[in-house]
């Protein structure tokens, strides 16, 4: 007589954790398998995506330098902020000046800020 799946499930459902552990070990021995989790392979194109060039950059003002007024003017010109907001950005360095811009815009902003005397990073 064959045992129905429902009967097996009902028997397993009534077992304690210790009994379930012993059952798993018995299955491993009987059928030569392992109950260890299977490592899932990543997507095949994962390596290509990692090599892909970054398209969005953030320009970070790390230090205002000695000519703070010129740096504030440069920040105002680049961001369109008011005088007080631009001063707060410069005083709060390190702070992002431009976010999510393309490489050319990031390099241009870095150049303007460095010409004004600031220290800048592009991330």
Curated annotation (Swiss-Prot):
Listed GO MF terms: mRNA binding; structural constituent of ribosome
Disulfide bond annotation, renumbered to this chain: none
Keyword Ribonucleoprotein: yes
GO cellular component, one term: cytosolic large ribosomal subunit
Keywords assigned by UniProt, alphabetized: Ribonucleoprotein, Ribosomal protein
One BP term from GO: translation
InterPro entries: Ribosomal_bL12 (IPR000206), Ribosomal_bL12_C (IPR013823), Ribosomal_bL12_C/ClpS-like (IPR014719), Ribosomal_bL12_oligo (IPR008932), Ribosomal_bL12_oligo_N_sf (IPR036235)
Physiological role: Forms part of the ribosomal stalk which helps the ribosome interact with GTP-bound translation factors. Is thus essential for accurate translation.
UniProt similarity note: Belongs to the bacterial ribosomal protein bL12 family.
Assembly description: Homodimer. Part of the ribosomal stalk of the 50S ribosomal subunit. Forms a multimeric L10(L12)X complex, where L10 forms an elongated spine to which 2 to 4 L12 dimers bind in a sequential fashion. Binds GTP-bound translation factors.
Full protein name: Large ribosomal subunit protein bL12
Record organism: Burkholderia vietnamiensis (strain G4 / LMG 22486)
């Amino acid at each position: 007589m064959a045992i129905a799946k429902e009967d097996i499930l009902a028997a397993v459902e009534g077992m304690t954790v210790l009994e379930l552990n012993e059952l798993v070990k018995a299955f491993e021995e009987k059928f030569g398998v392992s109950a260890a989790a299977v490592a899932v392979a990543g997507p095949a194109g994962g390596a290509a995506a990692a090599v892909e060039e970054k398209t969005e950059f953030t320009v970070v003002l790390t230090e205002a330098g000695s000519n703070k007024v010129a740096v504030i003017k440069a920040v105002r010109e680049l961001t369109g902020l008011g005088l007080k907001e631009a001063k707060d950005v410069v005083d709060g360095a390190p702070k992002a000046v431009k976010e999510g811009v393309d490489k050319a815009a990031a390099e241009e902003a870095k150049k303007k800020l460095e010409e004004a005397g600031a220290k800048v990073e592009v991330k």
